[in-house]
Amino acid sequence: MSDYPKTPQAAHLTALVELISSSVNEVISVYSAAGRDIPSLDSLEEGFLETPATTPPGLRHARQIIEAACAQLCVTIAQPGDCIVNKAFAYTESACLQVAANAKISDFLADKPDGLHTEELAKLSGVDAGKLGQVLRFLATKHVYREVRPNVYANNRLSVKLMSSDPVSCNVGVCTGELFQAATAAWDTLSDKEYGPSYLPTKTAFRKVHGATFFEYYETHVRLNLPRFSGAMVGWGNITDRGLLPQMYEWQRLEPGATICDVGGNNGHATLDLVKEYPMISVIVQDLESLRPRWSDLWARELPDAIQDGRTSFVPIDFFRDIPVRNCDVYYIRHILHDWPDASCVQILRNVKEAMQPSSRVLIHEYVLQQTTRDDVTVENDSAPEPLLPNYGNGRIRRYYQDITMLLGLNSKERTLQEFIDIGAQAGLKFVKLWDGGQTALVEFSC
C-alpha cells in the first residue's frame, strides 16, 4: 500500500479495512479465549455467544464495527448506480423470505443434512418446483440455505431461524406480510393531503392498505395473525437485549423489597428476568385487564414462588387515563412510547410522574437513535470511530428499520436521546442518565 499515493480517499479505504481487520481479530480472540471455534455458516448447532445476554460487550462492539465498515467499504468502491438499484431491489429478499417461511422449507429440511431436491420440496410445500428453485437459489446467494449440489438445498445457520418452531420466523412472517404490504403505500400516504400531515394512528400507510389501524388489525384477525404477532414479539425479545435488563442498570443499589412498576408490561416477561436475577425485588405488572391471564400463566409457569410470596402482582391500567400504583421505586416502561406520538407519550409520563415519590426513578427501555452527523455526538451517545458514520450505520441498522416501521404502522417513531429528554421535560421529569445496552438503552429520569 505504501507504493501508492496516500490520497484522502485512499486513507479512508485503508481506515475501513483496518477497522475490519482489528475487529475480526477481536472476534477470533473472544472465541479463542472461550476455547470455541467461530461457527460456520453451514453449522446447524445452537451457536456459542449467539444471544444478546451471552455476548460480551467487546464482541458485540466488534460485530457492529465489522457490519458498519464492510457496508461502508462496499458502497464507497461500488458504482453508485449499482448501489441504488440493488437497494431498490431489496423487496425481492423480503418476498423470497416470505415464500420460504410460509412454505415451511426449513421445517422440511430439518434432519436432512444432505438436503432435498426442489422437486421433493415442491411436493411437500405445494409450490411449483421451478419457481421454488428460483426462490431458493436467490436465498442461497444471500447466504440463507446452502445449495449442496444443483437444485438440492439444505439448511444452514441462517435458514434454521425460519423454522416454525423458532419465534424469529414469526418476525419474518409479520415483516414480510402485513408490514411489507403497508410499505408499498409509503409515498401514497406521505403525499396524501389528509394522511400526510397527520400523526393520528388512523391515518397511516398500514390503514391505507389494510383498512384498519395496526392494533385493530390484530384484534380482528385474531385466529390467523395474532398468534404470529405474539410469537414475533417473543422473537423480537430474543434478538434484542430484553435478556440484558438485569445487567443494564444498577439494580443492586435498590433496597431489599424495592418495587418495580412495569407500566404497559403485558405479561411481565421482561421484568420476570429481573426478579429471577434479583429475588429481593418485587414487580407490579400494569396493563389492560384482558392481559391478566397471560401474566398469571407466565409467572405461574416460570416463577410460581413470586406469586405465592407476593413478589409479583397484576394491577389493571389504562395508562392514558389512570395513575400507576403510587410510590414505587422504579417505573419501567419498555417499548411503549415508540407506539405513540409525542403528545400521547407526554400524557403517559405525566400520569407516571403523578405516582412517583421523590426518590422514584423512571426507566424508559427503547431504541435510542443517533443522527448521521457528528454534530449529534455527545458524552451520552456511544459513537462509532471515524471514518464510520457516528451512529454505526449498517452496524445498528435495525433500530432505523424499526423507526420507519413505526412511521408506516402507527404514525409514531423511535427517538433520539434529545427527543426523550424533551418529552420527559414536558411531563415534568428530569433526565438523569443513559444506560446503553448495546442495542436498546435505558433512559433514566427523576421527578
Swiss-Prot record:
InterPro entries referenced in this protein's UniProt entry, alphabetically: COMT-like, O_MeTrfase_dom, Plant_O-MeTrfase_dimerisation, SAM-dependent_MTases_sf, WH-like_DNA-bd_sf, WH_DNA-bd_sf
Biophysicochemical property: pH dependence: Optimum pH is 8.0.
Protein name as annotated: 3-O-methyltransferase 2
PROSITE patterns hit by this protein: SAM_OMT_II (PS51683)
Pfam family, one: Dimerisation
Role according to the record: S-adenosyl-L-methionine-dependent methyltransferase that preferentially catalyzes the methylation of 3-OH phenolic compounds like isovanillic acid and 3-OH-4-Met cinnamic acid. May play a role in promoting lignin degradation by methylating and inactivating free-hydroxyl phenolic compounds, products of lignin cleavage which are known inhibitors of lignin peroxidases.
GO biological process entries: lignin catabolic process; methylation; secondary metabolite biosynthetic process
EC top class, as a word: transferase
Catalytic residues, chain numbering: H338
Record family assignment: Belongs to the class I-like SAM-binding methyltransferase superfamily. Cation-independent O-methyltransferase family. COMT subfamily.
Example of a GO MF term: protein dimerization activity
EC number annotated for this UniProt entry: 2.1.1.-
Lineage: Eukaryota, Fungi, Dikarya, Basidiomycota, Agaricomycotina
UniProt-annotated binding residues for S-adenosyl-L-methionine: G264, G265, D287, D318, F319, R334
Alphabetized UniProt keyword annotations: Lignin degradation, Methyltransferase, S-adenosyl-L-methionine, Transferase
